[in-house]
Every structure is written in structure tokens, then in C-alpha cells.
A protein has these predicted regions:
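Non-heme Fe(II)-dependent double-stranded beta-helix
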Residues: 2-20, 27-155
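A structural signal for short, well-ordered beta-strand segments and their strand-loop junctions
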Residues: 25-28, 105-109, 171, 185-188, ...
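Short, glycine/acidic-rich beta->alpha junctions
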Residues: 88, 154, 167-168, 222-224
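A structural signal for well-ordered alpha-helical segments within the folded catalytic domains
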Residues: 90-94, 170, 233
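Active-site region of the double-stranded beta-helix
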Residues: 139-148, 157-168, 174-186, 191-193
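Histidine-centered catalytic micro-motifs
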Residues: 153-160, 244-245
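Double-stranded beta-helix
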Residues: 166, 179-245
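Short beta-strand His + acidic residue motifs that chelate non-heme Fe in jelly-roll/DSBH
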Residues: 172, 245-246
Length: 246
């Protein structure tokens, strides 16, 4: 994931679609073999299994809930690997210049892991039951906390991580592996950005068919918005506004 601050053909939505919908699909614009190579380097850094987690006894000795995510310049695997395949991709660069201007900069880059339920120890499942935004960082062993680990994330805006910042940034996601509906793909709500900033948790009702939401913000606005599941091949790139619910 990248948070990126202030003559291209946009796949699927186009630049006009970004303004209207609050997100843009660029498609599989990064070479798949290069994505495989990068993913292999990540996989070699640790065993992706239940061994990522502290034991209950270890956690209770010193429970920590703050600063458990990689930051810029601190405890961040993404800063130790060559990401030129993303950062120097011509389509990405030109897209960001179109949206943010020629002097855009990367605020943060990091790897995000969507954790399978079977990896998670039962005591952590119980401890996080009912929590809307389940960042598993507090339960991860310190030596593995250089990535972000999620499960069961409720709809939110990325502004939640930058409460004091003007929302002049976008979030850009790159799939390093093929992602289908069974692999916790991104689900976002096109046009939901039109309500602007809203505090978490958001007042949202999901339709029975899970194809739309009824969104009521704190200022009294209410509207139905469609949901879009973002599946794609390795190398697929998407980006969205700081206000887009996902």
C-alpha cells in the first residue's frame, strides 16, 4: 500500500471516473513476474502462519496497543526492499501527476497482510470479537511487526490515520498475487467520498445481497451507495481518495 500526496489512458473508470467515483482502477499494469519476485522476497522474511503471533502469556506480560504498525523511517519492511517496479512505473507516475500534481510525494509505503482465520490463535479471536477495526498489530511478535496485519476490517476512510492532515492524498494498492473473491479482496463504495470527512465508526447498513450500503453520515446526509469488490491479477493497481469508504 502507498499513501501518495499532492497523456494517460485510465483503465475502466478514467480520470473523470476518479473524480466522480472516488477511485480508479488502472488494471494489471505491473509485470506479473516482477510481482512474484517481490512477493517471494517478502515470504522469505518469515513463516506466514500462527507463528506470527505472541502467545497469550507473552502478550499479557506487556500488552501494547500503540505504535504497532510500520511507519515512515521506522520498522518498515517496504523501505528495505526495491519497489521501483511500482514507484517508477510510468502509468502510476503519470496518473499521480494528473491527480495530485507534479510534486507529489510518498507519505508512507508498507506491506499489508490479510490474515486467514486459521492462522489466528483462538484466544486472539475471542479477544478481538466485536472490534470493528481489527488491526492485529498488538498481537504480532515484535520481529514481525514491520508489516500491517488485518482481519475483519469495517468500512472506514483512510483519513482515520491522518486526523490532523488535509485530505490531499490518495491510497494506492498493488496486488502482488492474484486476488479472487475468496482472498479478502478490497471492497469499496464508489461515490461515497461525496459526503466528505466523517468520524469512525460510520453509520452504515449493508443490503441483504451485500451489493450496496445505506450510508448516514454525522451531518444528517443519507444515500444508498453501491459496493464494488476489487479482484484482479498480480500487478493490478487501484487508488482512491481519503474519503472513500472501503
Amino acid at each position: 500500500m502507498f499513501l501518495i500526496d499532492q497523456k494517460i489512458e485510465f483503465f475502466m473508470t478514467g480520470l473523470d471516473g476518479f473524480v466522480e467515483n472516488g477511485f480508479c482502477e488502472l488494471g494489471p499494469i505491473i509485470d506479473g513476474k516482477k510481482c512474484e519476485s517481490l512477493l517471494n522476497k517478502v515470504v522469505q522474511t518469515r513463516e506466514f502462519s500462527s507463528k506470527l503471533f505472541l502467545s497469550k502469556e507473552e502478550f499479557l506480560k506487556n500488552p501494547e496497543f500503540r505504535d504497532k504498525n510500520p511507519k515512515k523511517g521506522k520498522n518498515n519492511l517496504a523501505e528495505k526492499l526495491d519497489l521501483d517496479l511500482i514507484e517508477k512505473n510510468t502509468i502510476i507516475q503519470e496518473s499521480m501527476e494528473k491527480v495530485l500534481g507534479p510534486n507529489y510525494k510518498i507519505l508512507l509505503k508498507k506491506f499489508i497482510v490479510s490474515v486467514p482465520l486459521q492462522w489466528i490463535p483462538d484466544w486472539i479471536k475471542e479477544d478481538t470479537k466485536g472490534i470493528a477495526l481489527t488491526n492485529l498489530g498488538p498481537y504480532i511478535r515484535p520481529e514481525y511487526s514491520d508489516m500491517t496485519y488485518f482481519i475483519g476490517v469495517d468500512f472506514h476512510q483512510d483519513l482515520i490515520d491522518y486526523k490532523e492532515k488535509t485530505a490531499n492524498f490518495v491510497t494506492l494498492y498493488v496486488y502482488l498475487d492474484d486476488v479472487d473473491v475468496n482472498m479478502s479482496p478490497l471492497v469499496l463504495s464508489p461515490r461515497s467520498h461525496i459526503f466528505g470527512a466523517d468520524t469512525f465508526p460510520h453509520n452504515i447498513s449493508i443490503s441483504d445481497d451485500q451489493n450496496s450500503i445505506e450510508y448516514n453520515n454525522k451531518k444528517g446526509r443519507s444515500e444508498k451507495f453501491e459496493l464494488k469488490t476489487i479482484i484482479g491479477k498480480k500487478g493490478s493497481v487501484n487508488f482512491w481518495t481519503a474519503f472513500t469508504l472501503h
